[in-house]
Amino acid sequence: IPALIKSINRSDILFSIYDGDIKDGSSDCTDDGYASALTMFNQLKRPVVYTPGDNEWTDCHRLNNGGYDTLERLAYLRKTMFPTAASLGRRTMPLLHQGQPGEKFVENTFFSHGGIVFATLNIPGSNNNRILDDKECSYKSARTAADCDAANAEYLERDAANISWMQQAFKSAKAQKARGLVLVFQADPGFDLPETEGLDESQAPRYSGYRNFLDGVVMQTEKFTGQVLLVHGDTHFFKVDKPLYSPTRLLPNLTRLQTFGSPLIHWVRVTVEPKNPNVFAIQPVIVRQ
């Protein structure tokens, strides 16, 4: 991490976006973990926008994460990581939030820069906190049946809020005549991989918590004349492709950027190029340890 921070600080970027996971997936979800993340973010010289990942709330129910109440951890995350309307970093920038500081949906943010609209959304891994059955509820978990019922209710409410926030981002991009829109969240929401013809991975039950949102993205992208960059983490290796169809036609104006993850501690530079019809130039930056 120190080498990563040093590399970013040496660059001439204007701001950065951190797409979730401030701890590993098998350590306790202690209060100290969030404090350490704040310290890390505030070592960055320029503004950094943070969106939550599954490691810091969705998966905290796991026994190897300390067996926490995930909804309590989500509430604590909102209060701790989003105490004001500004970004993180030594130098901050103002952000619009879907909720008030420290409250529900404050983690969903919005800002514009250089003719591009940016929106971050709380869409974490582990099927977006959607629990499919009793076996999944209790597997290596401290959860009760009541906890899982509450988690599914939380998923439904947040899924609706995320879809609304995404729709508002598209509406704003159209109103501004923006050349591009960037949507950032942590989860790999599941796409149909072209390497496995005859199998549509996106329809697997473990991705069911993302279907409503992705269907909405497809619908909005079809009606948007600019370029859409969909950025996520979770899968831990770098990838750029065009994975969405509507329903069988490739969406030419949507590009997926999957970012690096542990143990590959690198970052990705995205540049807006006015004369580039694709708008976004994507460059992986390898950090030498």
State the predicted function of each range.
Residues 31-37, 210-213:
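Charged helix-capping and loop-helix junction motifs
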Residues 28-31, 61-69, 193-208:
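Short, flexible/disordered intra-domain loops and linkers
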Residues 6-15, 119, 135-243:
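His/acidic metal-ligating clusters that form di-metal
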Residues 33-161, 165, 245-271:
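Extended active-site neighborhood of metal-dependent phosphoesterases/phosphodiesterases
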Residues 1-33:
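N-terminal active-site segment of His-dependent metallophosphoesterases
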Residues 24-26, 52-61, 126-131, 189-192, ...:
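Active-site environment of divalent metal-dependent phosphoester hydrolases
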Residues 17, 49, 111, 230-232:
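Residue-level signal for helical boundary/lining positions with a hydrophobic bias
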Residues 273-289:
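A short C-terminal boundary segment appended to hydrolase-like catalytic domains
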